[in-house]
Amino acid sequence: MFCEKAMELVRELHRAAEGRLPAFNEDGLRQVLEEMKALYEQNQSDVNEAKSSGRGDLIPTIKFRHCSLLRNQRCTVAYLYDRLLRIRALRWEYGSVLPSALRFHMSAEEMDWFNRYKKSLATYMRSLGGDEGLDITQDMKPPKSLYIEVRCLKDYGEFEVEDGTSVLLKKNSQHFLPRWKCEQLIRQGILEHVLS
């Protein structure tokens, strides 16, 4: 059946939970592109035959194949675009370093796009707020308090707070730190927010 493989790509993303990135389906995408190539070649052959011999009975078949080509194209673009939106959201959620499990699900082109997006965002943030720039990825929601209690999940080493004091982050140690300094480490899984 025409367009089934393309629809399966879209269904695959639809079934994935919000914020999750399923593995890049290179094989499915290749099958869709091969189907599109076959449809295009069949259409070209029928168009040439219809022109040369004046066969009007081929027109509905040509139109049907053309509609199938357009549907395959829309599904493919929707699949790739939705993946890029999810990858962009991952940059805001995890920061500039993605966990290896997420990188494993991305194609080489998607990793390249992520790196270019990351650099573009970093350049923009450096252009804001004076010498140090402004990190717009912090405080995605307004904080209720400026300091939070955190527990260290992994040995991290020394961590410098903005006033110059250093805190040693060892596994299972608890600290009271500025929220904006630890949000990145919370996203990376080094710290966890202790809710009292």
Curated annotation (Swiss-Prot):
Keyword Nucleus assigned: yes
GO biological process: DNA strand elongation involved in mitotic DNA replication
SUPFAM superfamilies with a match to the protein in the record: GINS helical bundle-like
Keywords: Chromosome, DNA replication, Nucleus
Subcellular location(s) of the protein: Nucleus; Chromosome
Keyword Nucleus appears in the UniProt entry: yes
InterPro entries linked: GINS_A (IPR021151), GINS_bundle-like_dom_sf (IPR036224), GINS_Psf1 (IPR005339), PSF1_C (IPR056783)
GO CC, any one term: CMG complex
Pfam family, one: Sld5
Function noted in UniProt: Required for correct functioning of the GINS complex, a complex that plays an essential role in the initiation of DNA replication, and progression of DNA replication forks. GINS complex is a core component of CDC45-MCM-GINS (CMG) helicase, the molecular machine that unwinds template DNA during replication, and around which the replisome is built.
Subunit structure: Component of the GINS complex which is a heterotetramer of GINS1, GINS2, GINS3 and GINS4. Forms a stable subcomplex with GINS4. GINS complex interacts with DNA primase in vitro. Component of the CMG helicase complex, a hexameric ring of related MCM2-7 subunits stabilized by CDC45 and the tetrameric GINS complex.
Protein family (similarity comment): Belongs to the GINS1/PSF1 family.
Protein name: DNA replication complex GINS protein PSF1
Organism encoding this protein: Bos taurus
Lineage: Eukaryota, Metazoa, Chordata, Craniata, Vertebrata
Gene: GINS1
